């Protein structure tokens, strides 16, 4: 299934951040029920200037709308919710 964002929006696959305690216990980000703040752009509308497919973007933790496509979760972000691109 192909998803094409409309308007100034992008489709982002969230990047899970793994945290480790001082004693070496690994705590996945989803254990704290907070969304990661960066992800990979999988699709971008023509109006979404400044970001391209494959870019790693940083966004506010609670930005966007979560959707499921083919049993994977993605985030649809408005362009103005993207804080920057990691190069």
Swiss-Prot record:
It is found in: Cytoplasm. Belongs to the GroES chaperonin family. It comes from Campylobacter fetus subsp. fetus (strain 82-40). It comes from the Bacteria. This is Co-chaperonin GroES. SMART domains: Cpn10. Keywords: Chaperone, Cytoplasm. Its main location: cytoplasm. GO terms for biological process: chaperone cofactor-dependent protein refolding. Together with the chaperonin GroEL, plays an essential role in assisting protein folding. The GroEL-GroES system forms a nano-cage that allows encapsulation of the non-native substrate proteins and provides a physical environment optimized to promote and accelerate protein folding. GroES binds to the apical surface of the GroEL ring, thereby capping the opening of the GroEL channel. PANTHER family: 10 KDA HEAT SHOCK PROTEIN (PTHR10772), CO-CHAPERONIN GROES (PTHR10772:SF58). GO terms for molecular function: ATP binding; metal ion binding; protein folding chaperone; protein-folding chaperone binding; unfolded protein binding. Heptamer of 7 subunits arranged in a ring. Interacts with the chaperonin GroEL. GO terms for cellular component: cytoplasm.
């Amino acid at each position: 299934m192909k998803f094409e964002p409309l308007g100034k929006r992008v489709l982002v696959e969230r990047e899970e951040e793994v945290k480790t305690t001082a004693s070496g216990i690994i705590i996945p980000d989803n254990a704290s029920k907070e969304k990661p703040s960066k992800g990979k752009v999988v699709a971008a509308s023509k109006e979404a200037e400044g970001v391209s497919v494959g870019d790693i973007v940083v966004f506010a933790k609670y930005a966007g709308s979560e959707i499921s496509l083919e049993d994977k979760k993605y985030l649809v972000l408005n362009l103005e919710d993207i804080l920057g691109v990691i190069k």
